Amino acid sequence: MEDLQTRIAALSPKQRALFESRLRAAAAPGPDPAIPRRPDDDGPVPLSFAQHRLWFLDQLEPGRPVYNVSASLRIGRPVTTEAVRDALGALTRRHEVLRTVFPADGGEPRQHIADSLTPPLTETDLRALPDSARAAAALRLCAEDKQRPFDLSSGPLLRCLLLRLRDDDALLFLTFHHTVFDGWSIGLLRRDLTALLHAAETGTDAGLPPLPIQYADFADWQRRMLDEKRLGELLGYWRERIRGAPPVIDLPFDRPRPAVATTEGARRRFALPAELTTALRDLAARSGATPFMTMLTVFAALLHRWSGERDMVIGTPVANRARPELDDLIGFFANTLAMRVRIEPGMSFGDLLAQVRQTVVEALARQDLPFERLVDEARTERTLTHNPLFQVAFVMEDGRDASELDTLLPERARDTHTPDSAKFDLTLVLTDRESTYTGYFEYNTALFEPVTIDRLGERLALLARSVAADPGWELAALPVLTRDEIRHLKEVNAPVADDPRHHRTLHGVLEDSARRHPDHTAVEAPDRQLTYRELDEAANRLAHHLLALGVRPEQPVGVALDGTADAIVATFAVLKAGAVLLPLDPEYPAERLEHILRRSGATLLLTQRSLAGRFAGNDVTTVLLDDDATRAALADGPADRPGLPIAPDRLAYVIFTSGSTGVPKGVMVPHRGIGSLTRSAEQFAQTPDSRVLRFASPSFDVSLLELLMTFDAGATLVLEPRALLVPGEDLARLIRERRVSTVLLSPSALSTLTAGELPGLRTVVMAGEAATLELAQQWCDGRDVFNGYGPTEATVLATIARCAPDRVPPLGRPVAGYTVHVLDDTLRPVPFGRQGELFLGGVGLARGYLDQPDVTADRFLPDPSGTEPGARLYRTGDVVRWGADGELEFLGRTDHQVKLRGFRIELGEIETRLEDHPGVRTAVVLVRGEGSDRRLAGYAVRAPGEERPTAAGLRQWLRDRLPGYMVPELFLVLDALPTSPNGKLDREALPDPLAQSGDTAGNRPPLLDPVEERISGIWQEVLGIAPPGSADNFFEVGGNSLSATRIIARVNQAFGVRLPVRSLFVEPTLSGLARSVSAERAEELP
């Protein structure tokens, strides 16, 4: 048995395919009758199912060379053009399919076989060129020839290029449309052409075996053989196999998937070492699997580790030549099988190989079902965005069928000389040569950069080496990080040199600046100005006063003051007294303020007379800093520093942030984190001449960064009451009048300002929300613009990036002292390009959540890679990835990724595309509704000076740029988006578009217009359905690719237009198709 497995494993892919097909045929109940010849007068010749699939794809995207295939024959002797031409004519006489074209009538194609055909032959003499130039010229000419499209209706579907390389050396390069030629045909072509060429040169008989049938006989037989009973059996199996499969596989693309898929592609080649190839073949033999099964499993494991997908469909071609009558017949017989792979938690590579082996055996036994029938029966959403059922393919070729064109240049050099197309997002093509596996990744260049695919080749070799050595590897643990990636992660997370400046407390920063710049203005508020000496002394007096009131270490003290110098004095006084700062925003609802005070345990509150009434019902002692008695007591108090020893682990402040349950949770931040904050502030390079606006709400931790970056530089902090800090013209006027040079704003707030109107604003720091390309383009001209990222749990900022006008602002790299980790759901590092959840580590982490140990344990985890005892990681809930340049890119929130109708959707991607609309300043997308009624809803704010966009206009804008499943059904155009007191978007306050009516929400009237009525009648006749409504989708009411061509033919005839088949995929609803008709008719009017 072991010897048999070894012999099977040693078969070439072509031998193996033939063996498996014959084995399956031998297992059938009895011998099938031979395929009969078709009577000459039996009416129109039908297309085979495979031909019809490619004919339809050509109708969908006419004029594309993506389904051009080629073969070549090296002629190592002098040869005459006449002999080549005679051999080609004899070849087409032997194989009718090479004389076939596909005219159509009423959207129904048929085969038309010409009586005779001598293929077009172009001859080019390259003999005068040097060797290297000759090879390059030959490759270029062949590549250009392969990219020329064919006309399927008129043909011919074969053309030839004769390249004379030397007097005794020539290359015959043939390009076919795939409808008449497949990979299996390459060997037959070489055999037949070699014999026919020799016969033409010598005047002898070629000695080729007679063909019992022609391709048209096969096509007719296939249509008859696959009767309803057999089709039902096959469909039953395949429907069950793909039931519930995700419609797309989400790979780590470098660019968003375009609304209409392109076919521009490229190839990146690789070769597995001989010893690894041998080990993989041995693994196949030990596992009772073929090399094809083994390498398909390796590919599936690679896709899982690279993308995180657990349920995927991988397409693979099969020769589909089980009948002996087809052995010598050139033509397109190949079918495509959809191999579904499902990965369970804890599964090993060996487990997956056993699953794949079973899947392949079952699929080969049922390979007769035409792929297009499966697509139609699956009722998958038909779109021009991606291939149905699968977008990733795997091919394993026999090395003996490799193109003789490959001998002209070294393997690596071929990629640069062979511009190509890509049928799918990604295809792995392996060639099984005697000593090694070589191959290439064919990829869509609209989605991937070459460097990403090169890294993928490295990952393949890493993973293959691991499983060849031990198939017991858990899939989730398989190594796929390249050496460069590992080196980068070590560099960005490397420990930093110790610096005493980074051990200071926040009030220590103030004290240092008071020594260096005692008479420089520290605070400029509407009520008064304070120098650094005055601010330090005022904070000292208040700190002594607090100590006299009995304030203890780590006792929370509330501070609720609005835009006055006292607000800054109180902040530093609480810290100098060794207490815990509890900043409160007076604009918060009374219920929220009461909850924070009660939950924090604060018994002392520093506020002002105008705000005292807001806290009257709370059980706290109130100190009114603007009260005359308080002022007098403070004036008589000591101005020296209390000088209390404060350990780094003592709490500095507690800030309450929104909780997922709606109840705020208190984040406890120790003084240790201020050192990390100092490192952050240093990157903004402020000077004593800088004037920093205090914009953030005091209950938002960015307000502390505003203080630190100002006072560490000896600069001036500009204060205004919160009521005047209104984004828009009021804020712009304030920045001009107060000569503000530096701001820290949320992108929402920054988007309300115009860069050209604020020339004095020299430093802009964006934080708190995802920054946009539009903001970078507007503000990066001549300014220092930064994107800062960091949750409250990591002391304000953990990463910083300097922005550039030509890219979406990234999160950048970690601030010194922090570590960043992009992990999967098993808490393992993910490869570059793949999205994962961001975890933060380092000295800047908060202690946890106040009185919530369970929540703390859930969000703060032990750091398995930490070098210090007790090292922890904070789970941010943010979805990021490492970009190709080694910077972190923000993708969204884990709770902002949704799944609708099987599609995983990142709402932020839709928002970004909406904001690209010239009439939209900012946008938000949510999911509204419940259960099966869940729908995407888009909200847009009109851009200043632009016409108010309509729901229909926004919908069409997105349709032109995004897949259909990412286009919201509902739209609301608003004057402004609701925000919370800290300037962030308040999603909960957005209105429900389901309650709106008219064009704003995108609702359509139910009545049909005359064009819709006429199209409705055509749908009823062709599909045999009840009258459809204007919003009905063609593919959801029973339409498929077969009926789509007939529908479009009928519509074009009825309205005198020339719509392409693709229009039904762009606008699959009845009303959408009617709009396309009306637009086409309008264009044709004089």
UniProtKB/Swiss-Prot annotation:
Pathway: Secondary metabolite biosynthesis; bialaphos biosynthesis. One of its GO terms (cellular component) is cytosol. Residues 510-901 are annotated as: Adenylation. CDD domains: A_NRPS_CmdD_like, LCL_NRPS-like. Keywords: Antibiotic biosynthesis, Ligase, Phosphopantetheine, Phosphoprotein. The modification O-(pantetheine 4'-phosphoryl)serine is found at residue 1041. One of its GO terms (biological process) is amino acid activation for nonribosomal peptide biosynthetic process. InterPro entries: AA_adenyl_dom, ACP-like_sf, AMP-bd_C, AMP-bd_C_sf, AMP-binding_CS, AMP-dep_synth/lig_dom, CAT-like_dom_sf, Condensatn. SMART domains: PKS_PP. Its cofactor is pantetheine 4'-phosphate. Its EC number is 6.2.1.67. It comes from the Bacteria. Disruption phenotype: Mutant cannot produce PTT. PhsC cannot take on the function of PhsB and vice versa. Residues 22-43, 983-1007 are annotated as: Disordered. Belongs to the NRP synthetase family. Modular protein that contains a condensation domain, an adenylation domain which activates the alanine residue into an aminoacyl-AMP ester and a peptidyl carrier protein domain which bears a phosphopantetheinyl arm to attach the activated amino acid. PANTHER family: FATTY ACID SYNTHASE, NONRIBOSOMAL PEPTIDE SYNTHETASE. Involved in the biosynthesis of phosphinothricin tripeptide (PTT), also known as bialaphos (BA), a natural-product antibiotic and potent herbicide. Adenylates L-alanine and loads it onto a peptidyl carrier domain via a thioester linkage to the phosphopanthetheine moiety. Shows weaker activity with aminobutyric acid and L-serine. This is Phosphinothricin tripeptide synthetase PhsC. It comes from Streptomyces viridochromogenes (strain DSM 40736 / JCM 4977 / BCRC 1201 / Tue 494). The gene is phsC.
